[in-house]
Design a protein with these regions (language model features):
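Enriched but not universal
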Residues: 1-21, 190-209
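Extracellular, beta-strand-rich glycan-interacting domains
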Residues: 3-5, 51-56, 151-180
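Extracellular glycan-recognition modules
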Residues: 17-89, 165-170
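Surface-exposed loop/edge segments in extracytoplasmic proteins
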Residues: 21, 76-77, 95-100, 125-130, ...
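Beta-strand-rich interaction surfaces with strong enrichment in secreted/lumenal proteins
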Residues: 36-38, 98-103, 131-132
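Short, aromatic/His-centered strand-loop micro-motif at the edge of beta-sheets
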Residues: 88-110
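Localized edge beta-strand/strand-to-loop motifs within extracellular or lumenal beta-rich domains
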Residues: 103-123, 166
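Flexible glycan-contacting loops in extracellular carbohydrate-active proteins
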Residues: 128-157
Length: 209
């Protein structure tokens, strides 16, 4: 042994404003969702980067048969990550569902769709070149579900999510509990805003972080 002291690894600590408690995750039960307030459209789609750290739990009533997606599945404005029938899928522009052919590995993963660099990755599972098509419509990016003809939802634990436009961080979502009414949702560190449930039911709060 060299006798050296062990190297300390710094951990970024996220401090939320007074009245909020940081959570490890929040969980939906197929009815809850969050509208991020960010739209994909013809002017920005090729600059967007969408990062979702989550565990997809499935059991969908409203999302359609085995479609478990975060983002937009609106015709002409596909921009999503997720899975269908046990296979990883993504959509990046236009109206084409992109089948990776890679089987889903259960558990927590970070999904990243980076249109600017034409990359789609799922942590520890896949890293591929993304097919990017033109966007001809406008649609909101959704968490715990996806925009379609209506909003479709599914069961999921979400640990964090970020949206970039080019090098600009537009949203940085952290799971939290809003006091005093103990409302679980996401706090955006960029806008300093709380995002509560836009659907039915209520999010399940994970343990305090």
């Amino acid at each position: 042994m060299s006798g050296r002291s062990p190297r300390l690894i710094s951990v970024k600590r996220i401090k939320l404003p007074q009245g909020y408690t940081k959570l490890s995750y929040i969980e939906s039960n197929d009815g809850e969702y969050i509208d991020t307030g960010v739209s994909v459209d013809a002017t920005n789609y090729n600059k967007l980067k969408f990062v979702v750290d989550c565990e997809i739990l499935g059991s969908s009533g409203s999302s359609g048969t085995n479609w478990f997606l975060n983002g937009s599945n609106t015709n002409g404005a596909y921009f999503y990550t997720g899975q269908y029938n046990g296979t990883y899928y993504y959509g990046c522009g236009g109206s084409a569902d992109q089948n990776t052919g890679i089987s889903v590995v259960s558990g927590r993963h970070t999904f990243t769709l980076d249109a600017a660099n034409k990359k789609f990755t799922v942590s520890g599972v896949l890293d591929i070149t993304a097919t990017v098509a033109n966007v001809t419509a406008t649609a909101r990016l959704i968490l715990f579900g996806f925009s379609y003809t209506t909003i479709r939802t599914f069961r999921q634990k979400l640990y964090s999510a970020q949206i970039y436009q080019g090098e600009t961080l537009m949203c940085d979502f952290v799971p939290c509990m809003k006091m005093p009414n103990q409302q679980a949702g996401l706090f955006d560190l960029v806008s300093q805003r709380f995002f509560g449930n836009d659907g039915t039911g209520a999010f399940i709060a994970g343990p305090a972080a």
